[in-house]
């Protein structure tokens, strides 16, 4: 099968979902750009989302909350985070009730960090030098996403937008101590260009959305390479549910960046080899748009799929027909 034929196969998978009409999710004001959505681990089906203060960044909006907890109905439960994050990008809700948010914004002495909040909105841990750059153990040149393993070990994807030569995965202990890092800028195995999203399956395998390379790379938790998957398109966001179903948001494919592929949400069972079984196309698509459209962040619970959108500045909900 050629690359073009493979793309057409993934583009033509059935779509058993429809969008909930209108702006979904009440946060008390207009939505800003958002690429960060996750599901609470307490069985409630509640949704965590971090958005960019009604704009595409929180700088100059220090009195505006950026982290929200929503019920499946869209009703607001709580919000916090004002003045702490310049550009919320990735979010992860851990099994102990912690909520982690990555900051890809930067100014002197602030940003390029990962913050852990408790349920009261208090910062209880921060990883990364404020405003730091470079590739040192605690310096992040754009931390795109965060995932915490059941063991408590912390994985951070570094290199938002493929900046410089700092494209890597870093691993920290549960108390924030550096353990190791792997990867460098490039197109080969163990190389990344804009590692944009992280997820983990029930076997503890780490999935890295290597966006600019149009692939997902799979690793064990020691950084040993396992496989490369290209069938999910150009991955901006990843989510794996409790049944090992992988959800991938492709917000950037076009004829220049990923020829033959369409933007949208691809869904496939990991236990079935990761073949795409569902494709929710991006209805806002400009076929050759150079920016981003549709879902960039992705999560799912109780039969619904949630897509966090940067371009349209909203959280979109999809339900089964």
Regions found by a protein language model. Name each.
Residues 4-321:
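Eukaryotic scaffold repeat domains enriched in small/polar residues
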């Amino acid at each position: 099968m050629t690359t073009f034929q493979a793309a057409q196969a993934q583009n033509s998978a059935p779509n058993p979902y429809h969008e909930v009409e209108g702006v979904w999710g009440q946060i008390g004001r207009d939505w800003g750009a958002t690429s960060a959505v996750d599901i609470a681990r307490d069985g409630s089906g509640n949704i965590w989302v971090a958005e960019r203060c009604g704009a595409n960044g929180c700088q100059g909006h220090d009195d505006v909350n950026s982290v929200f907890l929503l019920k499946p109905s869209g009703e607001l439960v709580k919000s916090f985070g004002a003045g702490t994050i310049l550009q919320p990008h990735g979010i992860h809700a851990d099994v102990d009730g912690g909520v982690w948010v990555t900051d890809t914004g930067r100014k002197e002495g602030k940003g390029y960090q990962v913050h852990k909040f408790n349920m009261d909105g208090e910062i209880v841990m921060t990883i990364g030098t404020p405003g730091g750059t470079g590739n040192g153990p605690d310096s992040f040149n754009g931390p795109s996403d965060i995932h915490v393993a059941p063991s408590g070990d912390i994985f951070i994807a570094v290199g938002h937008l493929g900046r410089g030569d700092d494209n890597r995965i870093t691993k920290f202990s549960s108390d924030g101590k550096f353990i190791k890092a792997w990867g460098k800028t490039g197109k080969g195995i163990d190389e990344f260009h804009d590692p944009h999203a992280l997820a983990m399956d029930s076997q503890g395998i780490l999935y890295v959305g290597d966006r600019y390379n149009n692939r997902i790379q799979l690793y064990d938790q020691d950084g040993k390479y396992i496989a490369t998957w290209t069938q999910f398109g150009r991955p901006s966001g990843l989510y794996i549910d409790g049944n090992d179903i992988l959800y991938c948001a492709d917000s950037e494919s076009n004829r220049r960046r990923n020829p033959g592929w369409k933007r949208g949400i691809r869904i496939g069972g990991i236990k079935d080899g990761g073949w795409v079984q569902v494709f929710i196309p991006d209805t806002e698509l400009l076929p050759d748009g150079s920016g981003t459209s549709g879902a960039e962040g992705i999560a799912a619970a109780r039969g619904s799929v949630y897509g966090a959108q940067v371009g349209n500045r909203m959280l979109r909900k999809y339900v089964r027909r």
